[in-house]
Amino acid sequence: MGCSSSTERLTSTKNINIVTSPAQQQKKNAQDTKVKIVLLGDSGVGKSSIALYLCHGRFSEKHQVTIGAAFLHHNIELKNGATMKLHIWDTGGQERFRSMAPLYYRDAYGAVVVYDSNNVESFDSLKYWINEIKSNGPRNCCIMVVANKKDLPQKLNSEMVMKFCEQENVSFIECSAKTGENITTLFEKLASRIYSRFKEVLYYNNP
Protein backbone atom coordinates (compact mmCIF):
# COMPACT_ATOMS: atom_id res chain seq x y z
CA MET A 1 0.00 0.00 0.00
CA GLY A 2 2.84 2.32 0.83
CA CYS A 3 4.40 1.68 -2.55
CA SER A 4 1.17 2.48 -4.36
CA SER A 5 0.72 5.69 -2.39
CA SER A 6 4.19 7.03 -3.21
CA THR A 7 3.76 6.21 -6.90
CA GLU A 8 0.61 8.28 -7.09
CA ARG A 9 2.51 11.28 -5.80
CA LEU A 10 5.21 11.18 -8.51
CA THR A 11 5.05 14.04 -11.02
CA SER A 12 6.92 14.71 -14.24
CA THR A 13 9.58 17.45 -14.07
CA LYS A 14 10.16 17.83 -17.80
CA ASN A 15 7.88 20.88 -18.05
CA ILE A 16 9.18 22.59 -14.91
CA ASN A 17 11.21 25.76 -15.52
CA ILE A 18 14.12 26.26 -13.13
CA VAL A 19 14.32 29.95 -12.17
CA THR A 20 17.81 31.34 -11.56
CA SER A 21 18.74 34.64 -9.99
CA PRO A 22 20.32 37.43 -12.12
CA ALA A 23 23.64 36.81 -10.35
CA GLN A 24 23.52 33.09 -11.17
CA GLN A 25 22.64 33.82 -14.79
CA GLN A 26 25.51 36.32 -15.11
CA LYS A 27 27.93 33.74 -13.76
CA LYS A 28 26.61 31.10 -16.19
CA ASN A 29 26.94 33.49 -19.14
CA ALA A 30 30.43 34.63 -18.17
CA GLN A 31 31.63 31.03 -17.93
CA ASP A 32 31.19 30.72 -21.70
CA THR A 33 32.68 34.13 -22.49
CA LYS A 34 35.53 34.16 -24.99
CA VAL A 35 37.58 37.32 -25.54
CA LYS A 36 40.41 38.14 -27.90
CA ILE A 37 43.61 39.71 -26.52
CA VAL A 38 46.50 41.01 -28.64
CA LEU A 39 50.11 41.36 -27.49
CA LEU A 40 51.90 44.32 -29.09
CA GLY A 41 55.37 45.83 -28.85
CA ASP A 42 58.81 45.87 -30.45
CA SER A 43 60.67 42.67 -31.22
CA GLY A 44 62.62 41.28 -28.27
CA VAL A 45 60.63 42.93 -25.47
CA GLY A 46 59.31 39.58 -24.24
CA LYS A 47 55.76 39.29 -25.59
CA SER A 48 56.13 35.59 -26.38
CA SER A 49 57.81 34.98 -23.02
CA ILE A 50 54.89 36.60 -21.20
CA ALA A 51 52.40 34.43 -23.09
CA LEU A 52 54.52 31.31 -22.53
CA TYR A 53 54.72 31.87 -18.78
CA LEU A 54 51.00 32.60 -18.49
CA CYS A 55 49.92 29.51 -20.41
CA HIS A 56 52.64 27.02 -19.46
CA GLY A 57 54.32 28.44 -16.34
CA ARG A 58 57.82 28.40 -17.76
CA PHE A 59 60.48 30.68 -19.27
CA SER A 60 62.84 29.97 -22.16
CA GLU A 61 66.20 31.72 -22.62
CA LYS A 62 65.99 31.11 -26.37
CA HIS A 63 64.57 34.04 -28.32
CA GLN A 64 62.55 33.04 -31.36
CA VAL A 65 61.11 35.69 -33.65
CA THR A 66 57.33 35.48 -33.97
CA ILE A 67 56.38 35.40 -37.66
CA GLY A 68 53.02 37.07 -38.17
CA ALA A 69 51.31 35.97 -34.97
CA ALA A 70 51.09 33.02 -32.60
CA PHE A 71 47.86 31.91 -30.94
CA LEU A 72 47.45 30.70 -27.35
CA HIS A 73 44.53 30.42 -24.95
CA HIS A 74 44.15 30.64 -21.19
CA ASN A 75 41.25 30.68 -18.72
CA ILE A 76 41.04 33.40 -16.08
CA GLU A 77 38.76 33.15 -13.06
CA LEU A 78 37.06 36.45 -12.24
CA LYS A 79 36.26 37.68 -8.74
CA ASN A 80 32.60 36.70 -9.15
CA GLY A 81 33.67 33.10 -9.71
CA ALA A 82 33.02 33.13 -13.46
CA THR A 83 35.61 32.04 -16.01
CA MET A 84 36.77 34.15 -18.95
CA LYS A 85 38.47 32.35 -21.83
CA LEU A 86 41.29 34.47 -23.23
CA HIS A 87 42.26 33.93 -26.86
CA ILE A 88 45.74 35.48 -26.97
CA TRP A 89 47.34 36.64 -30.22
CA ASP A 90 51.09 37.20 -29.88
CA THR A 91 52.04 39.49 -32.78
CA GLY A 92 55.47 39.86 -34.39
CA GLY A 93 57.10 43.19 -33.53
CA GLN A 94 59.75 43.39 -36.23
CA GLU A 95 59.40 46.13 -38.82
CA ARG A 96 58.64 43.71 -41.66
CA PHE A 97 55.68 42.28 -39.72
CA ARG A 98 54.13 45.58 -38.64
CA SER A 99 51.94 45.89 -41.72
CA MET A 100 50.28 42.59 -40.75
CA ALA A 101 49.52 43.62 -37.16
CA PRO A 102 46.19 45.43 -37.86
CA LEU A 103 44.79 42.14 -39.16
CA TYR A 104 44.93 40.83 -35.60
CA TYR A 105 43.40 43.90 -33.90
CA ARG A 106 39.92 43.16 -35.21
CA ASP A 107 37.46 42.12 -32.49
CA ALA A 108 40.11 42.45 -29.75
CA TYR A 109 38.64 43.41 -26.39
CA GLY A 110 42.06 43.95 -24.83
CA ALA A 111 45.61 44.87 -25.83
CA VAL A 112 48.80 44.24 -23.85
CA VAL A 113 51.45 46.71 -25.07
CA VAL A 114 54.87 45.52 -23.90
CA TYR A 115 58.19 47.33 -23.63
CA ASP A 116 61.57 46.31 -22.22
CA SER A 117 62.21 48.31 -19.04
CA ASN A 118 65.93 48.27 -19.91
CA ASN A 119 65.48 49.44 -23.49
CA VAL A 120 64.66 53.12 -24.05
CA GLU A 121 63.88 52.60 -27.74
CA SER A 122 61.16 50.08 -26.92
CA PHE A 123 59.61 52.63 -24.54
CA ASP A 124 59.75 55.29 -27.26
CA SER A 125 57.76 52.92 -29.49
CA LEU A 126 54.86 52.73 -27.02
CA LYS A 127 53.21 55.76 -28.58
CA TYR A 128 53.26 54.05 -31.97
CA TRP A 129 51.71 50.81 -30.68
CA ILE A 130 49.06 52.57 -28.60
CA ASN A 131 48.07 54.70 -31.58
CA GLU A 132 47.95 51.55 -33.71
CA ILE A 133 45.40 49.82 -31.50
CA LYS A 134 43.40 53.00 -30.92
CA SER A 135 43.25 53.75 -34.66
CA ASN A 136 42.78 50.23 -36.02
CA GLY A 137 41.29 48.30 -33.12
CA PRO A 138 37.75 48.25 -31.71
CA ARG A 139 36.43 51.30 -29.91
CA ASN A 140 37.09 51.32 -26.14
CA CYS A 141 39.54 48.42 -26.33
CA CYS A 142 41.10 47.93 -22.87
CA ILE A 143 44.81 48.75 -23.16
CA MET A 144 47.47 47.81 -20.61
CA VAL A 145 51.10 48.94 -20.89
CA VAL A 146 53.49 46.34 -19.47
CA ALA A 147 57.09 46.95 -18.39
CA ASN A 148 58.76 43.56 -18.81
CA LYS A 149 62.12 42.35 -17.41
CA LYS A 150 61.52 43.75 -13.93
CA ASP A 151 64.08 41.22 -12.65
CA LEU A 152 66.91 43.24 -14.25
CA PRO A 153 68.35 46.64 -13.22
CA GLN A 154 65.96 49.32 -14.45
CA LYS A 155 66.99 52.01 -16.93
CA LEU A 156 63.60 53.72 -17.10
CA ASN A 157 61.88 55.64 -14.33
CA SER A 158 58.53 54.06 -13.39
CA GLU A 159 57.01 57.42 -12.42
CA MET A 160 57.76 58.79 -15.90
CA VAL A 161 56.08 55.77 -17.47
CA MET A 162 53.05 56.08 -15.18
CA LYS A 163 52.67 59.73 -16.14
CA PHE A 164 52.81 58.77 -19.83
CA CYS A 165 50.13 56.11 -19.27
CA GLU A 166 47.89 58.59 -17.47
CA GLN A 167 48.15 60.94 -20.44
CA GLU A 168 47.25 58.08 -22.80
CA ASN A 169 44.45 56.89 -20.47
CA VAL A 170 45.82 53.34 -20.33
CA SER A 171 46.70 51.02 -17.43
CA PHE A 172 50.27 50.18 -16.37
CA ILE A 173 51.97 47.26 -14.62
CA GLU A 174 55.52 45.95 -14.23
CA CYS A 175 56.31 42.26 -14.60
CA SER A 176 58.99 39.67 -15.26
CA ALA A 177 58.41 36.85 -17.71
CA LYS A 178 61.55 35.19 -16.31
CA THR A 179 60.48 34.99 -12.64
CA GLY A 180 56.74 35.08 -13.35
CA GLU A 181 56.20 38.15 -11.17
CA ASN A 182 52.85 39.82 -11.96
CA ILE A 183 52.24 37.75 -15.12
CA THR A 184 48.98 36.23 -13.89
CA THR A 185 48.06 39.48 -12.13
CA LEU A 186 48.28 41.55 -15.30
CA PHE A 187 45.89 39.25 -17.18
CA GLU A 188 43.54 39.05 -14.21
CA LYS A 189 43.37 42.85 -14.08
CA LEU A 190 42.87 43.10 -17.82
CA ALA A 191 40.14 40.44 -17.78
CA SER A 192 38.38 42.23 -14.92
CA ARG A 193 38.40 45.54 -16.81
CA ILE A 194 37.13 43.88 -19.97
CA TYR A 195 34.33 42.23 -18.00
CA SER A 196 33.34 45.54 -16.36
CA ARG A 197 33.42 47.50 -19.62
CA PHE A 198 31.92 45.00 -22.04
CA LYS A 199 29.81 42.54 -20.03
CA GLU A 200 26.56 43.38 -21.81
CA VAL A 201 28.22 43.03 -25.23
CA LEU A 202 29.98 39.83 -24.19
CA TYR A 203 26.71 38.21 -23.10
CA TYR A 204 25.12 39.15 -26.43
CA ASN A 205 28.03 37.75 -28.47
CA ASN A 206 28.37 34.61 -26.31
CA PRO A 207 24.80 33.30 -25.94
From Swiss-Prot:
A GO molecular-function descriptor: GTP binding
How its function is modulated: the record gives:
Alternates between an inactive GDP-bound form and an active GTP-bound form. Activated by guanine nucleotide-exchange factors (GEFs) and inactivated by GTPase-activating proteins (GAPs).
> Where is it mostly found?
membrane
Q: Which Pfam families match?
A: Ras (PF00071)
Respond yes or no to whether keyword Zinc-finger is given for this record. Answer: no
- Give start-end ranges for the coiled-coil region(s): none
Q: Which residues bind GTP?
A: 41-49, 60-66, 90-94, 148-151, 176-178
Gene designation per UniProt: RAB5b
Quaternary assembly: Interacts with CK1. May interact with ARF1.
Entry protein name: Ras-related protein Rab-5B
Lipid modification N-myristoyl glycine sits where? 2
InterPro entries the record matches:
P-loop_NTPase (IPR027417), Sigma_54_int_dom_ATP-bd_1 (IPR025662), Small_GTP-bd (IPR005225), Small_GTPase (IPR001806)
Where does this chain carry the motif Effector region?
63-71
The species is Plasmodium falciparum (isolate 3D7)
Output the Gene Ontology cellular-component terms: autophagosome membrane; early endosome; endomembrane system; food vacuole; plasma membrane
Q: What does this protein do?
A: Small GTPase which regulates vesicle trafficking between organelles. May be involved in the trafficking of the N-myristoylated AK2 from the endoplasmic reticulum to the parasitophorous vacuole membrane.
- Biological processes annotated in GO: intracellular protein transport
* Keywords of the record: Cell membrane, GTP-binding, Hydrolase, Lipoprotein, Membrane, Myristate, Nucleotide-binding, Protein transport, Transport, Vacuole
Specify whether Membrane is a keyword of the entry: yes
Question: Which catalytic reaction applies to this protein?
Answer: GTP + H2O = GDP + phosphate + H(+)
The protein's topology relative to the membrane is:
Lipid-anchor
